[in-house]
Amino acid sequence: MVNNRISESTTTAVSNNGSPPKACAGCGGKIADRFLLYSMDRYWHTRCLKCSCCQAQLGEIGTSCYTKSGMILCRNDYIRLFGNSGACNACGQSIPASEMVMRAQGSVYHLKCFTCATCRNRLVPGDRFHYVNGTIFCEHDRPTGLLNGHLNPLQSNPLQGSPMLPDQKVC
């Protein structure tokens, strides 16, 4: 990533059975291993997925790695370089890196701040909601213009960034 966006990714292993060899995002070489590392929408050799600062290998399954300003970072170097907090889109207060958050359309929220703009009920993972012009609405309080629409309920795994219609989300 060349921009200033923050992205957190978890490293996972995927099977390479019967597939043509993939190219490693780090070295460009072919990955002939039985299992591939898949992180940040790219494939890697275990030895090639490293922190840009400390060179720590990030290839352990389940390890979090961060990207910002074109760098791949371990958690410690990310916090050292960019601080340990971001700002909540609702209240503007900082969010420590260790705290769980809710996300919608690139905005980040404290769990307690991810609420319907109308009824103020807190939305939790699995709740359907509508995100209209930066405002969150629960399914019950969605704007009337959406009530007569032809939107079907969506089911998604938000951790994998599945494509969604622009105004209806599932936490």
Swiss-Prot record:
UniProt feature coiled coil, ranges: none
Domain named LIM zinc-binding: residues: 22-84, 86-148
SMART domains xref list: LIM
Spans annotated as Disordered: 1-20
GO molecular function: metal ion binding; transcription coregulator activity
Signal peptide start-end: none
Alphabetical UniProt keywords: Developmental protein, Differentiation, Gastrulation, LIM domain, Metal-binding, Neurogenesis, Repeat, Transcription, Transcription regulation, Zinc
SUPFAM superfamilies linked: Glucocorticoid receptor-like (DNA-binding domain)
Gene3D superfamilies documented for this protein: Cysteine Rich Protein
A GO biological-process term: cell differentiation
Bias-annotated ranges (Polar residues): 1-19
PANTHER family according to UniProt: LD11652P (PTHR45787), LIM DOMAIN ONLY 4-RELATED (PTHR45787:SF8)
Name by which UniProt lists this protein: LIM domain transcription factor LMO4-B
Native organism: Xenopus laevis (African clawed frog)
